[in-house]
């Protein structure tokens, strides 16, 4: 099998389809100059074979293989190799063996995507790789590819390295691998033996001793456990006996406590009767006091009216301040609008150049039209003169000659005026020279004044800069008035909030409990008052009345963790002696008589015909409250299973439900309550204090107050900074005024000084001269115009007299043209005028709007001044009213002193009521203590009962042994039972157990037996490993023998090929491979002889001879592992020219079934090739010329084929460099 054709398309330097071939089955050569593209053919072969290392084909990425990397419009590159497989037997495997031709294509598309085709069908890269590797053509380990560097490498190889080449060819590497693996396995066996010995002597034997000891300890541990269990049983039996005895005692004490509770309740009722009697007496005193306090009521009424008036005036002031702020905002808006209009006017001013151009163009048109009209008037005048020789509308009347006379008179007048102006100007110039001389005398004095002016101007400029800086920094102080207004509004709001807060605070303080936490308690032990811990959700605010009626006085309860904390807090704060009633609620006392959950509520809703998710008609108290999730039990306790309903009917249906499980106490949103006992309450609830709402309102107002306080602080700071800056501005403005006045005075001095007077006269003369020059310029223009008119008239008279008819026709034609031209220009002038008028109209509109806004600004300022005046009047009125209020309060104080007798009686009655209340509180406290005692007893009863039940349930043996409890002569005799002695015995045993348990091994018995088994197993394994080691040593010895035999046989075969190849390449010379020191393990070396005269060293040879020797060895190695194709890249570079001519014969004789593709630069090499491809580079394109030589008859071949020389020229683009 051999390469028949290579087709390149868009690959490297081959932009179009290029067919290289046909190739000869044996010797093919490629030649060409450097840069001609010859190496690209070898790169193409490597590319198709699937080379991985792109550096070997001189690119970094696949895109670079496309012609000019795709920049010339070619985005795809492909290489196709056509193999001829007609020779039999084929080296290929199935299914390729019977195919005559095989085509492999590889394509690369810009972007790096590539694909393979095998016989025009898509193929995987692995299929292609397997195809070539089946032919021993592995491009990524290419033995068939010989580069120039490989020859140099072989020349410099040492004997051991040369031996390595033979080993590689012989396949003894496999022996080496097996031998190495066997040695590694033997080392592992040695290690295993060492490990087994180590385990036996260092682990197993010591472990056996250790486990024996652990086994004894474990038996002791089990015995101790049995003893402990016996003592614990006695102790449990004692606990059970004591708990059962405690149950009986608690039941007796509870009966006694209940009797005492009834006595205390009776005493409290009697105290309530006495309190009621004193309250009636107190009301009587109040009535008498009210009768005597009518004047006081009048004064109080007047006081309230004054306070109301002050409040009203403050509201008015606040409204006026708001109005003032509104007007100030309006003023700022007007200012912004004025600035906006000014900006627009400024924009028109910036576009003034364009407007001026339009205006100039318009003026030029006007002038042009006027000139043309004058010319038309002239022509018409002339025409009139020609037609009628009468008068016309011009200032000059009469015939042509009369007009000529008038023009000449006017010309004479103009010339006279010119002479007068010239003489006057000359006189004035002389006068100016005289005045300048006179001015020099006063220059010194003037310069001193001028210096003063410069100094003042500098000072003025500095002041202006400072003012500009301040105005920019503080935005022209526009915020000042706004901030003042904001401050007043905030102050008034805070005053109002403070009054509202005080009212709310008084309400809260009426129930607030002030307390201190003892040092032996934590802050978390006191949770706080109920009203602070819960909150009604905003969406359920309509339930507020119902919630307050349910909770009532419980809102003021102080919640603590337990009874002990309650007791400490009560005693520490001395609540019993205080005037305010304080109720402490320990968490453990919150006994819920009936717990209500969501499922119960849903059942109620279903029962009354509502949707189970309807939360508006039947309301679950947990849904409407905000609280800490840890306090859910408290909420259950507070509401005590009461539900809130939207109407009375729903309440009745739920409360009076025959099914008691679905019957609950209910209350309507209006406050009508229905109890399960059958009672109902309701009525007017107008005076109910909705305390939770007030507390939330208080918190909200307090937050508002703090927010306003922070805002006020911020506004005050800003205002202070602005006022400070404004003060600075006033000072600078005064300084600026002074500097401006100084400058005006200096300018007046400069004007009134002698220098200034003379200078003024000089300027007046200069102005007069300039004026005269302007008039003179007009006179010169008039003179020129009159001269031209006179000349023209004289010419017209002459022409008219010569040709009157023709003159008339010409004048008519000229007049017609002038009229048309004037009409055209007037149309253009009209358009220009409209454009200018639009711009001027827009400017005028903006100016009018600005003027209107300016007037509005003045009006707004006046309104603000009026409002400020009103605010001032209101504040004066407030101050006067406050003074009146103070006088009134003094009168009330004087009047109050006259009520001392009533007060004494009242104090006596109040004292009695307070004493009774105190006594009642003490009784209530005793009752509460008794209740707590009852709760403790009930708790103890429950604890004892629970203990009995728990012990009975968890220790089933109690049922059998209970009759023996506290019986003599049994293990459960409690007469001499001492808990501490039992505990000590148990403790002693547990201590011993703890010591044993540290190192106890509960599996010691099983482990001891297992370790004995392991010991026997390891001894058996040790014997097995020793036997395996012996077998491995025998295998290694056998491998060494086989390797030596195989290597020697390969050496002899390669030596034979080496001698034959070298003799073919170099006539009259012999070569051989010699074993170093008679031992193949020492390596081999190459020997050479000329005419049977063997050289001792290769150093005597030329470089070409040494290269030929290395080439022969490489080819001999290749022949051992024959492949269908060999590629040699410039291997003749190191060869002499006369050594290359026999390479063709060598290929034919030594490699009759292999194809050679050789890249060469030497004629001696390629001139003997069967087919020669010559590469050239013409006009940026590579060309390929094929030369097929006559095949001469070889000694090893009989086939003779006549091949005509043919030349195929393929134009290509610029190639890669070789």
From Swiss-Prot:
Sorted keywords for this record are: ATP-binding, Cell cycle, Cell division, Coiled coil, DNA condensation, Merozoite, Mitosis, Nucleotide-binding, Nucleus
Extract one GO BP annotation from the record.
Answer: cell division
Record flagged with keyword ATP-binding: yes
Q: Where in the cell is it found?
A: Nucleus
What family does this chain come from, according to its entry? Answer: Belongs to the SMC family. SMC2 subfamily.
Q: Which residues form a coiled coil?
A: 209-517, 693-949, 978-1045
State the organism of origin.
Plasmodium falciparum (isolate 3D7)
Superkingdom of origin organism: Eukaryota
| Name this polypeptide is given | Structural maintenance of chromosomes protein 2
Q: What does this protein do?
A: May play a role in the conversion of interphase chromatin into condensed chromosomes.
Task: Give the record's biotechnology entry.
Answer: Possible candidate for an effective malaria vaccine as determined by epitope response in sera.
Start and end of every SMC hinge domain?
525-654
Lineage of source species:
Eukaryota, Sar, Alveolata, Apicomplexa, Aconoidasida
Copy the domain comment: The SMC hinge domain, which separates the large intramolecular coiled coil regions, allows the heterodimerization with smc4 forming a V-shaped heterodimer.
Q: Do you know which SUPFAM superfamilies this protein is assigned to?
A: P-loop containing nucleoside triphosphate hydrolases (SSF52540), Smc hinge domain (SSF75553), Tropomyosin (SSF57997)
**A Pfam family annotated for this UniProt entry:** SMC_hinge
Tell me the disulfide pairings in this chain: none
GO CC annotation: what is one? nucleus
Q: Name the positions where ATP binds.
A: 32-39
- PANTHER family in alphabetical order: STRUCTURAL MAINTENANCE OF CHROMOSOMES PROTEIN 3
Q: Amino-acid biosynthesis as a keyword?
A: no
Molecular-function annotations in GO? ATP binding; ATP hydrolysis activity; chromatin binding
